[in-house]
């Protein structure tokens, strides 16, 4: 279990404290004579101009001469009209979530209409039965079927889809790691098709990248969702090439409403089983190899990174199938005996036994301090139920404080076995506020408000899903804590923009582009 408390870095911050230090005062007292002698020389008069300009640039930006503000890019590709919401604006988040759900539903239905026969052939007739049950268009024999059997069929169908997706991704990763001469005919075709998609994605990202303003944190935007999904899907399960509707595992699950059926019949919410439309490490690799060909090994790393998220989802579903469903069936039988319920139906009482609080769902949960809420907020990030892990990352932007800590797992109906290790969210939050209160950088009013906030529970502002694996999410959080250069780039602009940048860097990761600029050389007169 880890805990890290650090001061955040911003451009200009180190110079602000350096100008008032004792060492600086000694330098100022001796610099006059040295500068006078130097300026009298011929070389000195030519160099002074560049030196002064370099010094002014350094004082204004807080950089040493070898540093420069670079371009930072969040590693997600937004569809047209999308935007990362402000984490402290629940209304903004809710509106976006609802719009995305409607778009996804429409696109998934297209996949079902286009590939229905092929999907049934590959994954079995059970998918169609589950879909008909959810749509209320069930035939008599399906209507007479027990609800628990429909639930089992939905779980089994989802298991087949995730197994197939996992196998295909591993095949592609293995093919990419082989030498060209050692690949089979099928592997060669698979790699060639994937490379074509990467080239298309690279061209689209390159166009966006060239149009970006320098020295800004930005997202790559503007691709339509259909093109994006087709270009970024490593191995479509049905449909190939750059078709506008490819049957990805995510699309098949959505088209046949498997998660909705599982939720409707058992009360178990599986909306956290997600995979990124485009793997952030793919965007990072494309940006890294702008002017040259991307090696196969680098692509294999990205494929394996996405496969981690798929495997995590698969383990979660197996946990539900092997651990939770037998307990669910037992609870059903007990309730049937007590209440004398019909054998076919699942009583709502049984479902409620497997409901878990919203604040313990595997998502990024957002909280803020009751006072000075714009500056003081934190995220509680929870892993899948089978892993039972979580961490806390808190920010006080007014005094530039960040606090990261691994937390103990919560017990709930869907959780796996756990060890009593680590602290609770409340303990971490109180220590975070205690450290912020003791900081010498805070104003008197800010300190008073923090003391008041410490006596009450934080305000819960809702939650957001994350698409990457929990290990990658934790890696992104730790990079925000440790990487000074990243902090300098995300902590610029208005407060709401900084909060969005922090959330983007946590959910997707962030790539700093460009080489270091030699500022004095750049500013020196020819």
Curated annotation (Swiss-Prot):
Belongs to the orbivirus VP5 family. Keywords: Capsid protein, Outer capsid protein, Viral penetration into host cytoplasm, Viral penetration via permeabilization of host membrane, Virion, Virus entry into host cell. It comes from Bluetongue virus 2 (isolate USA) (BTV 2). GO terms for molecular function: structural molecule activity. It is found in: Virion. The keyword Electron transport does not apply. InterPro entries: Capsid_VP5_Orbivir. This is Outer capsid protein VP5.
């Amino acid at each position: 279990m880890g805990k890290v408390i650090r001061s955040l870095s911003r451009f200009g911050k180190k110079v602000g404290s350096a100008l008032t230090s004792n060492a600086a005062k000694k330098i100022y007292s001796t610099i006059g004579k040295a500068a006078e002698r130097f300026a009298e020389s011929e070389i000195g008069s030519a160099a002074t101009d560049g030196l002064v300009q370099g010094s002014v640039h350094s004082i204004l930006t807080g950089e040493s001469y070898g540093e420069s503000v670079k371009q930072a890019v969040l590693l997600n590709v937004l569809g047209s009209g999308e935007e990362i919401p402000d984490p402290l604006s629940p209304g903004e988040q809710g509106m976006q979530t609802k719009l995305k759900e409607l778009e996804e539903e429409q696109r998934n239905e297209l996949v079902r209409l286009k590939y229905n026969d092929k999907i049934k052939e590959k994954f079995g007739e059970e998918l169609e039965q589950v879909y008909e049950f959810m749509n209320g268009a069930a035939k008599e024999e399906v209507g007479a079927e027990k609800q628990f059997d429909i639930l089992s069929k939905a779980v089994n169908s989802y298991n087949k889809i995730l197994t197939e997706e996992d196998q295909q991704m591993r095949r592609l990763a293995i093919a990419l790691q082989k030498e060209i001469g050692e690949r089979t005919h099928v592997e060669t075709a698979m790699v060639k098709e994937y490379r074509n998609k990467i080239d298309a994605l690279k061209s689209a990202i390159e166009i966006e990248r060239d149009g970006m303003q320098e020295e800004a944190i930005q997202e790559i935007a503007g691709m339509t969702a259909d093109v994006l999904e087709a270009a970024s899907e490593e191995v479509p399960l049905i449909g190939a090439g750059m078709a506008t509707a490819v049957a990805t595992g995510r699309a098949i699950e959505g088209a046949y409403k498997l998660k909705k059926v599982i939720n409707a019949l058992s009360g178990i919410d599986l909306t956290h089983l997600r995979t990124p439309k485009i793997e952030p490490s793919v965007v990072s690799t494309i940006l890294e190899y702008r002017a040259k060909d991307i090696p196969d090994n680098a692509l294999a790393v990205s494929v394996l990174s996405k496969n981690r998220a798929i495997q995590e989802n698969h383990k979660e579903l197996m946990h539900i199938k092997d651990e939770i469903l037998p307990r669910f069936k037992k609870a059903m039988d007990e309730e049937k005996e007590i209440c004398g319920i019909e054998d076919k139906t699942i009583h709502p009482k049984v479902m409620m036994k497997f409901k878990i609080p919203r604040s313990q769902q595997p998502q990024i949960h957002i909280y803020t301090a009751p006072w000075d809420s714009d500056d003081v907020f934190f995220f509680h990030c929870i892993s899948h139920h089978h892993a039972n892990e979580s961490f806390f990352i808190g920010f006080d932007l007014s005094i530039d404080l960040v606090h990261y800590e691994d937390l103990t797992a919560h017990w709930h109906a869907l959780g796996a076995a756990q060890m009593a290790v680590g602290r609770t969210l409340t303990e971490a939050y109180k220590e975070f506020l205690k450290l912020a209160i003791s900081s010498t950088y805070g104003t008197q009013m800010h300190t008073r408000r923090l003391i008041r906030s410490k006596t009450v529970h934080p305000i819960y502002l809702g939650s957001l899903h994350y698409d990457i694996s929990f290990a990658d999410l934790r890696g992104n959080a730790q990079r925000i804590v440790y990487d000074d250069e990243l902090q300098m780039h995300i902590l610029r602009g208005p407060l709401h923009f900084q909060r969005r940048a922090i959330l983007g860097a946590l959910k997707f990761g962030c790539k700093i582009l460009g080489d270091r600029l030699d500022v004095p050389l750049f500013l020196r007169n020819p």
